[in-house]
Design a protein with these regions (language model features):
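Alpha-helical segment proximal to the catalytic Tyr-Lys
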Residues: 110, 155-156, 222
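Active-site helix of classical SDR
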Residues: 105, 142, 150
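Short, flexible catalytic-loop segment of classical short-chain dehydrogenase/reductase
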Residues: 169-179, 218
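C-terminal substrate-recognition "lid" of short-chain dehydrogenase/reductases
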Residues: 102, 202-231, 236
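Residue(s) in the substrate-gating loop at a strand-loop-helix junction
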Residues: 125
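Short, small/polar-rich loop/turn modules that mediate ligand/substrate recognition or access, typified
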Residues: 158, 163, 224-226
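Substrate-binding pocket helix/loop in short-chain dehydrogenase/reductase
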Residues: 81-82, 89-94, 194
Length: 237
């Protein structure tokens, strides 16, 4: 089960899971993106899903009661400091970036527990409790909460066959990144600034993060839980 599978890291991870032989349930709020994904990868089960809707998540959990893997990839990057963040901005970011994961984990965990196993992978960010980043006030706050949520689930269910880990990427190529760059004026200068964050002097690729997600979801990482896995081109050295 993959959220935000329509583009970027979510799409790359859904494809990577499928390439490993998984039966992938790919979800996204964008039906057009799902249609494209389904056409290119007809073995996937594609479902439109608004992760801000408890009712939609509950309905999906009745169709897929016990997934082996849950990859929570949905997220939104709000630009600005605390002075740029209204209560509405705060509530939206936390609802989408954190509460959506609470909803999906709470919906799918019972089936995992009945099965006696399950791997949950949550998308956090290097801009979180790992380190700060300028103009990422509510984004960093919400992604820090994802780290806390991940560790809490990991410790509560570690003896019941459930693993829960978080991925903390640096700046990764994606349509959402392109949108943020375009919104800030001098496109080439802004792009150079994003690239300069990483000592490797390049942006990450969705497929690189997808490979880490596959590892954390698989039995190859069976002795790993409650961890924040940084993949950031050296940003946090």
């Amino acid at each position: 089960m993959v959220t935000a599978a329509g583009q970027g890291i979510g799409r790359a991870t859904a494809i990577a899971f499928a390439n490993e032989g998984a039966i992938v349930w790919a979800t996204d709020i964008n039906q057009e993106a799902l249609n494209t994904l389904s056409q290119e990868h007809p073995t996937m089960v594609c479902r439109k899903l608004d992760v801000r809707s408890p009712e939609e998540i509950t309905r999906l959990a009745t169709e897929l009661p016990a997934p082996d893997i849950l990859f929570n990839c949905v997220g939104f990057v709000h630009h600005g400091t605390i002075l740029d963040c209204s209560e509405k901005d705060w509530d939206f970011s936390f609802d989408l970036n954190v509460r959506s994961m609470y909803r999906t984990c709470r919906a799918f965990l019972p089936g995992m527990l009945r099965a006696g196993h399950g791997s949950i992978v949550n998308m956090s960010s290097i801009a979180s409790s790992v380190r700060s980043a300028p103009n990422r006030f509510v984004y960093g706050s919400s992604k820090a909460a994802v780290v806390g949520l991940t560790k809490a689930i990991a410790i509560d269910f570690v003896k019941q066959g459930i693993r829960c880990n978080a991925i903390c990427p640096g700046t990764v190529e994606s349509p959402s990144l392109e949108g943020r760059i375009a919104a800030q004026g001098d496109v080439e200068q802004v792009r150079r600034e994003f690239v300069a964050r990483q000592p490797m002097a390049r942006l990450g690729r969705p497929a690189e993060v997808a490979a880490l997600a596959v590892y954390l979801a698989s039995d190859e990482s069976s002795f790993t839980t409650g961890q924040t896995h940084v993949i950031d081109g050296g940003w946090n050295i």
